[in-house]
Amino acid sequence: MDIKLKDFEGPLDLLLHLVSKYQMDIYDVPITEVIEQYLAYVSTLQAMRLEVTGEYMVMASQLMLIKSRKLLPKVAEVTDLGDDLEQDLLSQIEEYRKFKLLGEHLEAKHQERAQYYSKAPTELIYEDAELVHDKTTIDLFLAFSNILAKKKEEFAQNHTTILRDEYKIEDMMIIVKESLIGRDQLRLQDLFKEAQNVQEVITLFLATLELIKTQELILVQEESFGDIYLMEKKEESQVPQS
């Protein structure tokens, strides 16, 4: 089964998405948190054996350097260098944001003009950009990246990881649906509580994606950085009141 996640247009596009979730000025965001989310995302791609292009890895190296500088004792020279690296990164993200807004503006104008001509509009390179903002897919994947990172730490500490030859997505789909029996909703991270190893965690996630794809499940996230809940797809589904 081929489940495709929407790729970002590059590392700056991913960073911009992460920064935008804070809904504040780019220069005020908690950069260490953003770096950790970026690294978790890249690590998850690798764990799922999805291709990670070189530019993402180069950026990951730069981010790890910035993070390490921020964790060092506050010696003046080191602090200045760390601040310079951080400010340079934030400036790159800000410039990319402006470029992307310009691209979206040009695309809107292009579509507006196309209404007055009979021929089909020419495709622009920005056409795929709006799919990046699909919260259902992207926020789910980013949330899963954080869950997987925590589960890896848990497995490393336990030293009792149970391995199996193979996990089937079809079997995991049944487990996911059974987890919702008698519940209005299930918090995403609770789905992975009983998982015994990384491969089981990943297969559970792929099963969840497939159930969303087939519209058997829906996602609910009431606010940025809030918990993501899984719910069975029903007609005119309502978010249960707390």
UniProtKB/Swiss-Prot annotation:
Belongs to the ScpA family. Its main location: cytoplasm. The gene is scpA. Coiled coil: none annotated. Participates in chromosomal partition during cell division. May act via the formation of a condensin-like complex containing Smc and ScpB that pull DNA away from mid-cell into both cell halves. Keywords: Cell cycle, Cell division, Chromosome partition, Cytoplasm. GO terms for cellular component: cytoplasm. It is found in: Cytoplasm. The keyword Signal does not apply. HAMAP family: ScpA (MF_01805). It comes from Streptococcus pneumoniae (strain P1031). Pfam families: SMC_ScpA (PF02616). This is Segregation and condensation protein A. Component of a cohesin-like complex composed of ScpA, ScpB and the Smc homodimer, in which ScpA and ScpB bind to the head domain of Smc. The presence of the three proteins is required for the association of the complex with DNA. Disulfide bonds: none annotated. The keyword Cell cycle applies. GO terms for biological process: cell division; chromosome segregation; DNA replication. It comes from the Bacteria.
